[in-house]
């Protein structure tokens, strides 16, 4: 099974086959609007703008799993991301990243990598749909290690 075999509901509630992103490098991030790391939205948007024409897509999956820091509705989350951080990368419905009710996307991502321990954990998926790397919450979108891993994934 590949990441691209999965489907996830967009923030608007429509089912989105992740095969839409097949052939691209994907950065999956669990997000939250009321977290000390929430400013990473700006960095993720910059990363998306810098790399989207090279084959990277950033996917945001809001989650209320850590500290109840994403309590809003889908409409609240989308409005917050758009007005506060001018987010244009794809956002999905709020998910559980671990435990009971874990989303199929996160069940796949955590098969060979640790579950997120906090908001803004990042998984890098290669063009082949396999998870290539995982980065903790404090790894910022402009971190050299993350960008190097993205560059390497894009080169394959």
What spans do the regions from the language model cover?
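Thiol-based oxidoreductase modules, predominantly thioredoxin-like and allied folds used
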Residues: 55-72, 88-99
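N-terminal "domain-start" segment that seeds a small globular fold
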Residues: 1-19, 39
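Alpha-helical elements of Rossmann-like donor-binding domains used by nucleotide-donor carbohydrate transfer enzymes
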Residues: 43-46, 76, 104, 108, ...
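Conserved helix-turn-beta segment immediately C-terminal to the redox Cys motif
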Residues: 24-25, 34, 39-62, 82-85
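Short, thiol/selenol-centered motifs that function as redox-active sites or metal-ligating centers
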Residues: 32-44, 63-66, 70-71, 129, ...
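Short, internal strand/loop/helix patches
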Residues: 75-119
